[in-house]
């Protein structure tokens, strides 16, 4: 099982949904960088469960503790170890699936591959693991911002509801770009929960201030690296860079160049896998949460046809808590790409 990502600075995550702890180890970190648990906690609070009626009701405080690699709030260059306790586990909710596979989950494929699985909340495959990505990735946020790079994301679509972008809002809920849609969002999520269902979502990410020439041709393209990382997030099904090319011809999407710069940005800031200095535009689609409390047809480990009902506490829409995870992983990608570019300079 591969539990690490990164090129120069590498991050390893560990722990399971219903284990004692989850955590992350950052290796290859440079020294003398200020890091505070308070700053990490602020970012973790953006994704933690039980922050609204529209997320899982699992009550985890996600309190992070740094154990190594820090002295007087500065990195020493040694590996940085972070741990988060799991406090609100209800493993008994999953007793009925100890031998049954939940459709849409990792149960079936994990069992095929490893011949054994932790069925409690999905074990290692649970989105609980993404707290580790936020805790470790957000430490690069200020480094990225100090270089003039701004990473911002918003929810573009929930189920069939398209949310028209109006402005960046950082006061009430920074992930919704148009407060006029809040009541509609509440209605469709409430209706979804009441019918024991879940919804898909689409997230748009715009990165401004990226320097040109980040990324390498062919097998280390910046868009292939981003895809590799972001598609590892639970429930992601597709990723797109730039704007919709479907049913378009060349003249409609070609970004012409003048000595003053590009006249458009249909390619989303990337050409041939290398940044061109324009805003980087990414769209990610999340499938509906697989766990719902309806009875559904499946099989058990003996390949017997059965019907099964999933209990436990689950998000009605994954995208509502996905934005901090996406942004934290992008910080990790970008700092690695920036450091790698310096090697060639």
Curated annotation (Swiss-Prot):
Its EC number is 4.2.3.5. GO terms for biological process: amino acid biosynthetic process; aromatic amino acid family biosynthetic process; chorismate biosynthetic process. The keyword Zinc does not apply. InterPro entries: Chorismate_synth, Chorismate_synth_AroC_sf, Chorismate_synthase_CS. Its cofactor is FMNH2. One of its GO terms (molecular function) is FMN binding. It catalyses: 5-O-(1-carboxyvinyl)-3-phosphoshikimate = chorismate + phosphate. Disulfide bonds: none annotated. It comes from the Bacteria. Pathway: Metabolic intermediate biosynthesis; chorismate biosynthesis; chorismate from D-erythrose 4-phosphate and phosphoenolpyruvate: step 7/7. One of its GO terms (cellular component) is cytosol. The keyword Amino-acid biosynthesis applies. Keywords: Amino-acid biosynthesis, Aromatic amino acid biosynthesis, Lyase. Homotetramer. Belongs to the chorismate synthase family. PANTHER family: CHORISMATE SYNTHASE. This is Chorismate synthase. The gene is aroC.
């Amino acid at each position: 099982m591969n539990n690490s990502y990164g090129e120069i600075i590498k991050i390893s995550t560990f722990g399971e949904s219903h284990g004692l702890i989850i955590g992350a180890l950052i290796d290859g970190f440079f020294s003398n960088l200020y890091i505070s648990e308070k700053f990490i906690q602020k970012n973790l609070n953006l994704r933690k469960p039980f922050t609204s009626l529209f997320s899982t009701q699992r009550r985890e405080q996600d309190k992070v503790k740094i154990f190594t690699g820090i002295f007087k709030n500065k990195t020493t260059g040694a590996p940085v170890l972070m741990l988060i306790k799991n406090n609100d586990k209800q493993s008994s909710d999953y007793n009925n699936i100890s031998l049954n596979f939940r459709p849409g989950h990792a149960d079936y494929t994990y069992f095929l591959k490893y011949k054994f699985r932790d069925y409690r909340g999905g074990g290692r495959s649970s989105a609980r693991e993404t707290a580790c990505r936020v805790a470790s990735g957000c430490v690069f946020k200020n480094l990225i911002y100090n270089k003039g790079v701004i990473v911002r994301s918003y929810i573009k679509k929930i189920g069939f509801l398209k949310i028209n972008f109006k402005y960046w809002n950082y006061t009430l809920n920074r992930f919704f770009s148009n407060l006029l849609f809040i009541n509609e969002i509440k209605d469709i999520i409430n209706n979804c929960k009441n019918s024991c269902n879940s919804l898909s979502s689409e997230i748009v990410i715009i990165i401004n201030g990226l320097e040109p020439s980040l990324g390498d041709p062919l097998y280390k393209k910046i868009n292939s690296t981003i895809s590799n990382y972001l598609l590892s997030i639970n429930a992601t099904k597709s990723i797109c860079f730039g704007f919709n090319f479907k049913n378009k011809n060349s003249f409609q999407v070609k970004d012409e160049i003048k000595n003053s710069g590009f006249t458009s940005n249909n390619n989303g800031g990337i050409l041939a896998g290398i940044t061109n200095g324009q805003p980087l535009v990414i769209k990610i689609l999340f499938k509906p949460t697989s766990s719902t409390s309806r009875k559904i047809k499946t099989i058990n480990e003996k390949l017997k046809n059965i019907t099964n009902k999933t209990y436990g506490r689950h998000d009605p829409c994954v995208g509502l808590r996905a934005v901090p995870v996406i942004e934290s992983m992008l910080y990790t990608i970008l700092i690695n790409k920036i450091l790698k570019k310096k090697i060639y300079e």
